[in-house]
């Protein structure tokens, strides 16, 4: 599985960065915009799980969003592009979580960690 991921990832990065974003820098924003607006209009909290570029982070903040950066412990950025872009996002983040790497049999521990973090965020945002 890791071999396949390492082989395919450069193609996906090239498509997403060097083709898709060159055609429309806001392509990912435009893709989720209607869903986010629908959630907000219906008192739901939209969650965007992958923000890679400064214009995406700026759009979230312009729409009263909160940005949580989750950094997995002992895992470096996947490539130079990710490393470079993540530095640009630092000014937009509201929270940073250092996420431990859990084993396959550690779901309860993972859930406990997530609940604790979400509780902390609720206290700050309240």
Language model features: what each stretch is:
Residues 46-47, 96:
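Receiver (REC) domain switch-region micro-motif
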Residues 44-46, 66:
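Short active-site oxyanion
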Residues 26, 31, 54-126:
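Small-molecule kinase domains that catalyze NTP-dependent phosphoryl transfer to phosphate-bearing small molecules
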Residues 49-51:
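Short His-Asn-centered micro-motif
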Residues 1-43:
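ATP-dependent small-molecule kinase phosphotransfer cores
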